[in-house]
Amino acid sequence: MNHVQPMIHEDGLPGDESRLEPRPEWRPKYPGSGRLEGKVAIITGADSGIGRAVAALYAREGADIVIVYLLEDEDAEETRRIVEAEGRKAIVVKADVGSKKMCDRIARQTIETFGRIDILVNNAGEQHPDEDITDISEEQLLRTFQTNIFGMFYLTQAVRPHLKSGAAIINCTSVTMYKGSKDLLDYSSTKAPSRPSQDHCRKISSAKASASTP
């Protein structure tokens, strides 16, 4: 498989996808079959990358989408246009999932707009490549855990009272959880908790819970 090296790359966090050249490929390449017709999905980190691709695919399958993002307004609005082009409704919610208060607001806005929550995709994540463990600052360590672990818990707590039988919680994890990474020690350390948390969700609620490794 040939890989195209981008002419322009984005080192900032979160990345501004609108600046990339060539742009990442996200378009669904199959006709939808209505498998998510009438469902409402909250997708964190949906302004770009995996989150945008999931939003596009879910919309094609019939779901309305709550696009949760941190900073990149232009990217989030483009994801909204993508969803609406599929004939579905979308709202954008600018929020830091590392804040419990903001996670509560995400759930509240979803219920106020759509009246239901059927799917939660905990996709938002933060990673900072470092050559050595001594390069990881206290601020970076706290921020990575706040986003990747606390955010998953906070938002799952916020949507839990609104989930009915057949609902789904999807936690996006990483191959680094299994293999480790010499450059992403703090990031890979935050991915392991997604497995026990999903097992707990399955046992105490009516929602399906799964971990996805992109």
Each model region followed by its residue ranges:
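Amphipathic alpha-helical dimer-interface segment in Rossmann-like NAD(P)H-dependent oxidoreductases
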Residues: 56, 108, 112, 147-167, ...
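Catalytic Tyr-X3-Lys loop
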Residues: 134-153, 170, 194-195
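Conserved mid-core segment of classical short-chain dehydrogenase/reductases
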Residues: 4-5, 31, 99-104, 112, ...
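Conserved Rossmann-fold SDR core element
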Residues: 58, 116-118, 195, 205-214
